[in-house]
Each structure stands twice: as C-alpha cells, then as structure tokens.
Amino acid sequence: MKALLINGSPHANGCTFTALNIVAEELQKNGIETEIVHIGNKDIRGCIACGKCAELGHCVFNDMVNEVAPKFEQADGLVVGSPVYYAGPNGTLTNLLDRLFFSTPFDKRMKVGAAVVSARRGGTTAAFDRLNKYFTISEMPIASSRYWNMVHGHSAEDVMKDEEGVQIMRILGRNMAFLIRAIAAERERNGLPEKEVTRYTNFIR
C-alpha cells in the first residue's frame, strides 16, 4: 500500500515539506510506503477546457500533471500540502490539481485523501477547505486529525516548534494509514461500493 504526497510549495524543504514529512514518517511506521513529489518553481499552466483529455486519456499539456498522474493512479492515498497564499492554496498547485483530477480517467473512489496547509499566521482554514473539494467530488474518503490539518511558522524550524501542529500531522499520518488498511481489507472482501451512472442536472434550461 502506498501514499503519494504532493508538496505544493515552491520551497522544497520549507514549512509545507516539513509538515508533509511528519505525515510521511507516521505512514511509514504504520506500513504504508510513501513518495513525496515537489512542484517547486515549475511552470504548470491552468486548464483551458479544451476537452482533449477525454480523447487522449491524459492532459494535452505534457508537463508535471502527466508525470504525477500514474503515481496518483497507483496510490491508495493522496496527501496534498500547500502554503497559504491570500487565504487560499498556491495557484501553481491548484493548476496541477484542476488538471490532474479532471484529465485522469481512472477510478479515484475510496482512495484516501488529506490536505495539509501551512501559514505564518492566518488563512489556513479557507485554504484547507478548498483543497478538500478535490477529494469530496471524487468519492475519496478524507483522513482527519484532532484539529484541522495545519501548521504555523515562517520557517521549517518554526514549524517544529509548533507542538500542536506537529502532533496534528502525526495523528493524521496514523489515521490515514488506518483508513488505507481498512479500505484495502474491505475491498478484498467485498470490492468497491456500487458505482452509479452520473446524472447531470443543469439549472438553466
């Protein structure tokens, strides 16, 4: 079993990575293999709604989105970490997630999702809520902790001084590992829940 962790910060070893690494360590202690991928300062463009992914099975723009897609497909869990930019996630990260979730045809149901956010001071809950939307629209159960998944600090060293934040990340890792194992066991016994054909309703006719 494996979890993929995406560091949405331009800083490879900053606050967001520090939080993700704590989660990864707990996942590993509980039998879950982990991989952390870094967005860094890569130029990841947004979705242009061209619809070519429906024909190709992948995004028409061959950048990091198509590199991450097979890793996501093979993973049992996905942790997305972001610094807070104006009370929201990093724009480069949301570009990646918009295209990653929309362009990939594989079934995401019952992959466990979790969001982690870091900030010097405020905006964390709004950013956290936005990231969770990717999971809930994809039938992905969300792993939680004893508080919303956030850390505070202006540097990686500051984050490690946020004792409550560090504890939140540890608990998140353990809870996510439990969910991944539980879902894998149930899937082995009874398979996935019944999948319905999507019904689309437009409000303007």
Segments from the language model and where they lie:
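A short beta-strand-loop structural module common to alpha/beta enzyme folds
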Residues: I32-K42
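Cysteine-cluster motifs in flexible loop/terminal segments that predominantly coordinate metals
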Residues: K42-F72, R199-R205
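Short, hinge-like loop/turn segments at secondary-structure boundaries
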Residues: G51-E55, N132, K161-D162
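Glycine-rich phosphate/pyrophosphate-binding loop and the adjoining helix
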Residues: P141-R205
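Helix-loop-strand module that forms the ligand-binding subsite of alpha/beta enzymes
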Residues: L56-Y147
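N-terminal beta1-alpha1 ligand-phosphate binding loop
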Residues: K2-N30
